[in-house]
Design a protein with these regions (language model features):
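Long, C-terminal-biased catalytic regions of enzyme "large/alpha" subunits
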Residues: 1-192
């Protein structure tokens, strides 16, 4: 289904004409100047643009198989890394098949985390550590309910981008007011 959705997006973009966005297509923002009747697909083929597969709920998947405190379990961590690698490998195969760059994007998806969790709770009921918190965890992020320190969060999450975030990733930490302690942020920055 993910492949079908991404291919659908590619097909929709191919319907655009240079006149739809002249700055992008006619005036060179994409590195070429097309006439208003040219096919925009030539700008995206040969992996010149990316169509990305995002994901949520890796924490919840591991919780089903290993329990909700799986973060320190090496087998569970390897399992989740294998999931990310499998998504990356699928995207690489689709790139070869279609000659577009398909990638895995590990990023927050705030509106979907709530919506999908709500829909699943309606269908499957409230499940401890899965739907009871009313959201799914973004991509590979550490469970925020556990209040990890920025250092713990960075240490836990560091393997995931390399495992498969070919389309990029967003790493974030939440901090209290840093105006009184800018050195704390600098320490985290240096650690990262």
């Amino acid at each position: 289904i993910a492949k079908d959705a991404l291919v659908y997006r590619v097909e929709r973009v191919k319907e655009a004409t240079p006149a739809n966005a002249p700055i992008l297509y006619q005036y060179g923002a994409f590195g070429q100047r097309l006439s208003k009747f040219d096919n925009v697909d030539q700008l995206f083929k040969h992996r010149r643009a990316t169509v990305s597969l995002g994901y949520i709920g890796l924490y919840e998947v591991a919780s089903v198989f290993y329990g909700s405190d799986w973060e320190t379990n090496p087998e569970a961590k390897a399992f989740t890394l294998d999931i990310v690698k499998s998504m990356k490998n699928a995207c690489e195969g689709w790139s070869d098949e279609y000659d577009y760059h398909f990638s895995v994007y590990s990023t927050p998806s705030e509106s979907l985390t709530d919506r999908f969790c709500r829909l699943d709770a309606e269908k499957f009921g409230v499940v401890t550590d899965i739907t009871d918190k009313e959201y799914y965890t973004n991509s590979f992020h550490y469970d925020v309910r556990k209040n990890p320190t920025p250092f713990e969060k960075l240490e836990f999450e560091k393997a995931y981008p390399e495992a498969g975030a070919t389309g990029g990733f967003i790493h974030y930490c939440e901090y209290p007011v840093l105006q009184q302690n800018p050195k704390a942020l600098e320490a985290v920055w240096d650690f990262a």
